């Protein structure tokens, strides 16, 4: 785990760091443009067809060690990530653009926000997608909770390769989104992150079989926060992967928790 101060200090020791930020995460883009004023930056995905598909192209920015306000703002908005690369700003921009272009063959989908924390974690933790982030030796993403960055070492790949997301990868991505959301929610903020991850994975599994409304997602989330022990029972995964309705699962979840509680006090 690394603090923003430590990352910025490493720049003065010669570390070539860049940050990617999604302008579209800002309700008022002028807030971001003011923070990056005078900094060396490039619109990401320049010279790719996807540049025309989004209101504001993400920005690739070279950090200079004096950018704490910018980095802190991006961290708290979960709007991007930090990377280390020995390539020039223009070369790195082109390399990352090639990564996006390779995705044209990815089942017709475009993962233009591969640098957002949940998406980046999904890619970086997947062996099958280890070819991604070509040209970057390290990537830092905001931790689920707290004020530190988590570091991912990158293997060196010289040839672009297609990024293909499977249905299972989509579920993992949903779980990553939920982990970031739950970790800072009032119901989960004082609960160990290992339990938060379990809950997010459980909710993603439930939603993969039958969509959950926002109301029901909140209901399940708050119930799991109050009944953590149910997720460590051997029957839990069998229950949530059962192809029955979520209403039926809800009833059985109550029954399972009662059984777990009885066994605990027996």
Report residues per predicted region.
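A contiguous, surface-oriented mixed alpha/beta subdomain in the mid-to-C-terminal portion of proteins
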Residues: 2, 26-47, 55, 86-90, ...
């Amino acid at each position: 785990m690394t603090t923003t101060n430590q990352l910025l200090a490493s720049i003065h020791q010669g570390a070539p760091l860049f940050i990617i930020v999604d302008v579209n995460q800002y309700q008022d883009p002028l807030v971001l443009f003011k923070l990056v004023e005078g900094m060396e930056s490039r619109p990401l995905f320049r010279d790719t067809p996807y540049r025309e598909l989004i209101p504001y192209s993400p920005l690739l920015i070279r950090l200079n060690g004096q950018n704490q306000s910018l980095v802190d703002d991006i961290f708290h908005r979960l709007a991007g990530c930090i990377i280390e690369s020995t390539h020039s700003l223009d070369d790195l921009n082109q390399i990352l653009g090639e990564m996006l272009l390779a995705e044209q063959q990815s089942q017709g989908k475009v993962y233009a926000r591969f640098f957002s924390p949940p998406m980046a974690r999904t890619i970086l933790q997947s062996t099958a997608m280890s070819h991604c982030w070509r040209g970057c030796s390290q990537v830092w993403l905001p931790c689920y909770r707290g004020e530190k960055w988590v570091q991912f070492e990158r293997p060196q790949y010289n040839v672009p390769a297609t990024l293909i997301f499977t249905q299972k990868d989509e579920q993992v991505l949903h779980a990553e989104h939920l982990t970031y959301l739950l970790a800072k929610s009032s119901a989960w903020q004082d609960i160990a992150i290992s339990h938060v991850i379990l809950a997010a994975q459980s909710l993603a599994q439930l939603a993969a079989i039958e969509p959950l409304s926002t109301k029901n997602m909140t209901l399940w989330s708050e119930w799991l926060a109050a009944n953590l022990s149910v997720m460590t029972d051997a029957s839990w995964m069998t229950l949530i992967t059962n192809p029955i309705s979520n209403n039926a699962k809800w009833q059985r979840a109550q029954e399972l928790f009662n059984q777990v509680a009885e066994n605990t006090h027996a």
